[in-house]
Amino acid sequence: MFDHLKLLRCFSFTASRDWLFKQSFSNAGLRSVITDLSNGNPLASTTTSMHCWIPKSPNRSKPNLLLLHGFGANAMWQYGEHLRAFTGRFNVYVPDLLFFGLSSTSEPNRSESFQAQCLMRLMEAHGVHRMSIVGISYGGFVGYSLAAQFPEKVEKIVLCCAGVCLEEKDMEDGLFKVPNLEEATKILIPQTPEKLKELIRFSFVKPIKGVPSFFLWDFIDVMCVEFVEEKRDLIKSILKDRRLSDLPRIKQKSLIIWGEEDQIFPLELGYRLKRHIGENAEIVVIKKAGHAVNLEKSKEFLKHLKSFLIDSL
């Protein structure tokens, strides 16, 4: 029987790619830091630490930009192509959310509200008290919560394919391609090549085909095997008892970006979010793009980010 793990120990494409991203982030003027959010108290009953790429030499005359990732690979993979477009104009911060990359907590709270509170503590620990935010998918949930809880701290926000306005009943009403939440967690946190292939099909309009199982196993072993149950709890927490009527309306100027053919969070959720926020929000729908619009239509995605975040500076 073929032992993929033995081969992975000899060479890992995913680990090599991850190393290249680290070099790229470092060359862009960022450094990797893990921050203890337990206030250094050895007697604290819980511990929380967050990893973040932060500026090596922050310029306090520049505005601050917080880039929040979604499920899948770590933050570097999701923003690697766009980073250099912003480091010249912003102090850029790219954290790993809790249970991704090098961030974790012993707290039982799995809500995006708690993620947002930890992020605010992280940013304040680095002397950042006002910022703009880009949130992709799950990162958009956390970013929205940040904007709602700390309105005076957030200037602008970009929400990319973030189904913030979904409701628990949407699953029962058949809005999503998957039949139930359990199946959704198996796809979003793939543990087999078959489930990873499903995730790719759901994420891209034109998914790459014929990827050898070796590469799929490699990605899973490097990116998807840690904190599996905790990540599943994050997904379940999003949907549990969720009602649009309970969602606060944020006041910040907002840009909503959506892939027209998103199969994970259908476009209807983008329009629902626009109606919920109201006149402070504009929506951009990118054609021939799915949920991974930041990767599938990278140049168009970046064009809209720059127009919204930079042109008004």
Residue ranges of each PLM-predicted region?
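Alpha/beta-hydrolase fold catalytic core
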Residues: 1-65, 88-90, 310-313
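Conserved alpha/beta-hydrolase catalytic His-Asp/Glu region
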Residues: 2, 168-176, 187-251
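Conserved HGGG/HGGXW glycine-rich cap/lid loop of the alpha/beta-hydrolase fold
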Residues: 54-102
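Active-site loop/oxyanion-hole signature of alpha/beta-hydrolase fold enzymes
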Residues: 57-59, 84, 93-135, 303
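Flexible "cap/lid" loop of the alpha/beta hydrolase fold
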Residues: 144, 148-149, 153-191
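Short beta-strand/loop motif that positions the catalytic acidic residue
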Residues: 250, 256-258, 262
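Short alpha-helix in the alpha/beta-hydrolase fold that links the catalytic acid
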Residues: 252, 266-274
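Catalytic active-site module of serine/aspartate enzymes centered on a nucleophile-bearing elbow/loop
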Residues: 279-313
